[in-house]
């Protein structure tokens, strides 16, 4: 199981998750995408949420899948899951134990299960648990996606420090947009220096699909 988080929201988790799953499936690794918790959605009028995109991809493997099979807590409010849950369904806190069991059931059918979190690692799910706690409970490997803008160095290093302190098996990958030429002069020079000293180098996502698939499966 691979848990995908990010330096923050809008870093490109969903795009990267889909690309990695498509690559894995093309390589013969049967892969499913799950979005157990999603906020800021209105399923009655909008069918382009993260989970809807995942469902579209997943149904290439299993036409019987529905949205409820891959996304279990869905809220209108675009906020941390805890806040959305307390406002919209205050008597039904998110049960990460139940989620863990449901997500692990997919490992019986698929070679690789990719679980996308909401926001970053410290986003609260309950009063006691955040996304990092959830990933630890799942015993999943971690792929942390970084944006490619100015400031990514600080964001990557903070997340690297946090993940290292919890002794997770993790990789950090930069979601590099094709038109971001500034990255090569502004951020890449330090990333290259960091990688020379680190036993867990930061990679560029688009250039590392084979490596990331191998990491997820080993």
From Swiss-Prot:
Binding positions for substrate per the UniProt entry: 39
MF terms in GO: ATP binding; dethiobiotin synthase activity; magnesium ion binding
Catalytic center residues: 35
Cofactor: Mg(2+)
Principal localisation: cytoplasm
GO cellular component: cytosol
Binding positions (ATP): 10-15, 116-119, 176-177
InterPro entries: DTB_synth_BioD, P-loop_NTPase
Claim: Transcription regulation is one of the keywords in the record: no
EC number assigned by the record: 6.3.3.3
CDD domains (alphabetical): DTBS
Uppermost EC category: ligase
Gene3D superfamilies: P-loop containing nucleotide triphosphate hydrolases (3.40.50.300)
Residues engaged in binding Mg(2+): 14, 116
Compartments in which it is found: Cytoplasm
Pathway linked to the protein: Cofactor biosynthesis; biotin biosynthesis; biotin from 7,8-diaminononanoate: step 1/2
Biological process, per Gene Ontology: biotin biosynthetic process
Purpose of the protein: Catalyzes a mechanistically unusual reaction, the ATP-dependent insertion of CO2 between the N7 and N8 nitrogen atoms of 7,8-diaminopelargonic acid (DAPA, also called 7,8-diammoniononanoate) to form a ureido ring.
HAMAP family xref list: BioD (MF_00336)
Similarity field: Belongs to the dethiobiotin synthetase family.
Subunit architecture: Homodimer.
NCBIfam families referenced in this protein's UniProt entry, alphabetically: bioD
Descriptive protein name: ATP-dependent dethiobiotin synthetase BioD
Gene source species: Helicobacter pylori (strain J99 / ATCC 700824) (Campylobacter pylori J99)
């Amino acid at each position: 199981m691979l848990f995908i988080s990010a330096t923050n929201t809008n870093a490109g988790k969903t795009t990267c998750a889909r690309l990695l799953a498509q690559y894995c499936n093309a390589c013969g690794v049967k892969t499913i995408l799950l979005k157990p918790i999603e906020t800021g959605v209105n399923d009655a009028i909008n069918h382009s949420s993260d989970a809807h995109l995942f469902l579209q991809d997943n149904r290439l493997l299993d036409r019987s899948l529905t949205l409820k099979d891959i996304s279990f807590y869905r809220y209108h409010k675009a906020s941390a899951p805890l806040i959305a849950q307390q406002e919209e369904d205050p008597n039904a806190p998110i049960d990460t134990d139940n989620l863990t069991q449901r997500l692990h059931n997919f490992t019986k059918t698929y070679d690789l299960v990719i679980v996308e979190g909401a926001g970053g690692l410290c986003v609260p799910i309950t009063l006691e648990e955040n996304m990092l706690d959830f990933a630890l409970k799942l015993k999943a490997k971690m792929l942390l996606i970084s944006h490619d803008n100015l400031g990514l160095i600080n964001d990557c290093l903070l997340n690297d420090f946090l993940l290292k302190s919890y002794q997770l098996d993790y990789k950090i990958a930069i979601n590099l947009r094709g038109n971001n030429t500034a990255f090569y002069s502004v951020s890449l020079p330090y990333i290259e220096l960091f990688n020379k000293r680190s036993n867990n180098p930061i990679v560029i996502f688009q250039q590392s699909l084979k490596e990331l698939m191998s990491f997820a499966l080993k």
